[in-house]
Amino acid sequence: MSKPIQMERGVKYRDADKMALIPVKTVMTERTEILRKPEWMKIKLPADSSRIQGIKSAMRKNGLHSVCEEASCPNLAECFNHGTATFMILGAICTRRCPFCDVAHGRPMAPDTNEPVKLAQTIKDMALRYVVITSVDRDDLRDGGAQHFADCISAIREKNPSIKIETLVPDFRGRMDRALEILTATPPDVFNHNLENVPRVYRQVRPGANYEWSLKLLEKFKEAHPDIPTKSGLMVGLGETNEEILDVMRDLRRHGVTMLTLGQYLQPSRHHLPVQRYVSPQEFDEMKEEALAMGFTHAACGPFVRSSYHADLQAKGEEVK
């Protein structure tokens, strides 16, 4: 039996190095079929990238991270060019190693106690009115990072009194009650936690997570704050069927979730899970109709939709696809 790899704190493991640490492996070979992207998946880059560079510079200046960059989001150019970003707190190294995700794995450093203040000032400088705060998984922390979320929310509101805050939280595995006790004392305006995909493929797609646990997290927050919207998102193209997606949507409604995002999974590198199908815009439209019929008040469904894609418009109920 081989010895476990001793990871050095603060070192990022990506691509092949990260995938080598995953117990349930998908082995990619030269014979593995790579699906060609359909026309509707082609992205047009903005002609002027000055705003993009400005946001990147503001992030670097204050030692902050965006999930847009760390997870290689396909919407980065569009969102940055519109002056929006999803901030990723608690560092850029995740204690999980999901094979669909491009965020680095490893042993993260201790949380930056100055991050809440730096984040609040950056948001004020950018004159944002709606902000999404997410994080890597921090299984190394006793509260999973919940107190750091609360500190960030408080600091942001102190400097930006009229801002709306959406949190996209991890599952707080083994720490749910402790985390919820902290977060219910300093709640966001929207509470988001992604299920990512259907339970049948969880062991391969989301190792270390539990489908029922994630549903319970969403339900418990909603019970504590019935007036605050809860939200969840899924990726399609990882081996699930449309009927399985509909079943997950029904589960979300049974657990009080009212906001939904559905988007196409895209393979970050050849080392990550391959795309098994591309879902057409028409199918996404049909899923949105099903979601609204189930009672979701907001449903953003489309090939490029991501959990925080135009989150401000999603929260207003405007169409996003």
UniProtKB/Swiss-Prot annotation:
As recorded in UniProt, its EC number(s) are 2.8.1.8
Q: Give me the residues that bind [4Fe-4S] cluster 2, please.
A: 94, 98, 101
| Family matches, as InterPro entries | Aldolase_TIM (IPR013785), Elp3/MiaA/NifB-like_rSAM (IPR006638), LIAS_N (IPR031691), Lipoyl_synth (IPR003698), rSAM (IPR007197)
Pathway(s) served: Protein modification; protein lipoylation via endogenous pathway; protein N(6)-(lipoyl)lysine from octanoyl-[acyl-carrier-protein]: step 2/2
Primary enzyme class:
transferase
> One GO molecular-function annotation for this sequence?
4 iron, 4 sulfur cluster binding
Range of residues in the leader sequence: none
Residues reported to bind [4Fe-4S] cluster 1: 68, 73, 79, 308
Q: What is this protein called?
A: Lipoyl synthase
Gene this protein is translated from: lipA
